[in-house]
Amino acid sequence: VPDISIVCAPDATGDDGLTADVVEHCEEMDDRFGILQAGRTDSDVGNLSPPADTDMAAFYYPWLKVRNPETGLVEEVPPGGHVAGIYARSDASHGVHKAPANEVVRGVVDIQRPVTKGDQEVLNPRGVNCIRSFRGRGIRVWGARTASSNPQWRYVNVRRLFLFLRGSIEQGTQWVVFEPNNEELWARVKQTIKNFLTDVWEDGALMGSTPEEAFFVKCDRTTMTQSDIENGRLICEIGVAPTRPAEFVIFRISQWTGDSN
């Protein structure tokens, strides 16, 4: 199914096989982000941690209490569905570059068990995103870390912004399949990508006081070999600064042009 950006399996909790399937799927597809959740009985803060070290998912705790609209009874549910809704709401309101944290969890009565400031200080560095109840402020998601130990991909919004940028650029340059692989095409592709990234920077998603501090785009003989050019393979190198000006996360995209066999 195309255009999926978030994956959440409501029945996948804790360190079970379905959770592992979600992580494996997101890592293999490399264009979507998973929402993982603690098990219902996971209450030992000292031993709680994400079930996998991955930058393609985030882990949430604890379960939530909701009122069943049919019976009127309060039931406990895993947090993944509500968190997925918060992702979608934040994306629509602010953009994918905004961290889905300090967001009110709507439609819940309470959290399954209280999460203290001390719990937060233990769990957050491990990549456990806590859901907490604050007097007068409601129940909120109080963390936006991925389940990764890699500092580059520590935060959900940075990882998801990168996925969004790469996917958008790949989709927005598919037209090159009809074009000859020459310097004129490289200049057009470079300008197309720069125009897109300038819009992203102006929206506040990239850091830097100038576009040069926020991103760079290369599409020339330094990014392609003669063999690439002759075989119709166009390669661009792109750097973006999602957290600090001029500190670039670099990636490459490639497309087949009209010169490909």
Q: What do the PLM-derived regions correspond to, one by one?
A:
Residues V1-N261:
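Structured, hydrophobic secondary-structure cores that serve as assembly/anchoring elements
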